[in-house]
């Protein structure tokens, strides 16, 4: 067994119950979040209150922000990467579809400032995909784009080139279970193992290949692996703190990239609560938070338009469940750990905390209904965030919203 060695930099462990969103820590935190949002976020309180109210199922656009806020980060470090990201007002997130010539041309011709794409050459069936040529075309477009590579650093995916035919859960030992949300072929990993990290950080690893193809940075998925129950069990067995190890891991990825490309960006998907740790904040440039207001089910069933509870007080109430459409209610009932059992208020607390520390915020909601889409764009932008909406599978090109 090889585990990444511990260094002099250590963190205060976080209670496991808090990581899982359970127990008295969460209950006591609800009132605290409401108070802190009002007290801490001077200049953002009004917009945050409106966003917490959210769209009602009957009238999603009945409440809209009355003014647009500018994110303020008085203590933020003005790095080249954050300067580049601050210029992004429209972005595309497309990883569930093959990048055929027609799709690439639509992206090239679009007014998007940034696009997040899967690094297709890492897929077993796409090893010859001309990724570098596509990146160059997007850079050279009439409206040039930042091109960011999507990577899953907390799960092994059985369709990637690194996957070996004999691998299964428990062999190698750092593959610890199945995806808890039902995404087939995805397996949470004990990400602190050298064998896993070498796949990414090796001399000919995935990160170097991404940089060689001209990408402008990384979009890190499954940062939340530290909260997966199988990962937690493995961490306890190995005597490590999964939160600490994840921050070490993100810092290692960030250091690798920025030592070779100082203006390349690091965007972390979800896990906004890690913004409480300054060591984590220093390693990333932005957070992209999924389903702040709307979600869809795994495997795109339903594809979206399931509103989250607007406040902590509404979580898991009968009134909230009754307000859902039939497909969304099935999703709610089938997965007690889904985002439909978390409030927009909780997400907004951590996002605004991160924003105050100088982290740029992108939002990813899953909705197609025009009223819901319009409401999210207006609400997210009023908070100083940069929104994007699509299907849960992120499998279609979406035209930019002005």
What are these regions (language model features)?
Residues 1-3, 11-12, 36-37, 63-69:
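Short hydrophobic transmembrane-like helices used for membrane targeting/insertion
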Residues 6-7, 58:
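Compositionally biased, low-complexity intrinsically disordered regions
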Residues 8-12, 24-35:
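Bacterial N-terminal signal peptides that target proteins for export
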Residues 35-47:
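Bacterial N-terminal signal peptides
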Residues 48-79:
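Ser/Thr-rich, Proline-interspersed low-complexity disordered segments
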Residues 73-402:
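Glycan-processing catalytic domains of CAZymes
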